[in-house]
Amino acid sequence: MNKIKNTKKIISDSFNQKINFYNNDKYLGLNVNKSEIYSIIKFLKDNEHLLFNQLIDITAIDYPSRDLRFDIIYILISLTLNQRIILKSPVNENDNLDSITLIHKSANWYERECYDLFGIKFINHPDLRRIMTDYNFEGHPLRKDFPLTGHTEVRFDEQEKKVVYEPVKLSQEFRNFDYSSPWKGLENQLIGDEKAKKED
């Protein structure tokens, strides 16, 4: 039995509820319910046959048209098995997730980053505040409905000797860009050219 199949069997045997697996040759993926994230990650770390004891990342993907707007993603590695596992769970933008900082201390900053950039909240987090944007920043910049220009401009005012927030002032009107290239005679395709129709 290969390593991925063995890992899948250990997880299936240990959890009564049905877990939806997906995998390729390089890693095993689990689609899990948000209420099971904490217990599954704890199991993956503590089980002597798995030892997924290194948290690599926590991130999210925004799907604004879905009811469950975000997929929250946890990536773990077992150095013992030389194996990667990815947990994915769909969550609503108003859902509160259990913090896994008691299992993996490195989750602290990852969860803060998800909160700051996507607005996903984690309960029982020791210090859930913004980590990448300013404390007075409006909105969450990795949400797909966040305006490209932002809501405010931030600058340091030399006269007032403090940071000043002002409405965004654009030197030209906002433009939407299409990545298909209007240029003729280019040998190599530019990024986005694959969607432009080729002329005969």
What are the roles of these predicted feature ranges?
Residues 1-200:
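Terminal low-complexity/charged segments
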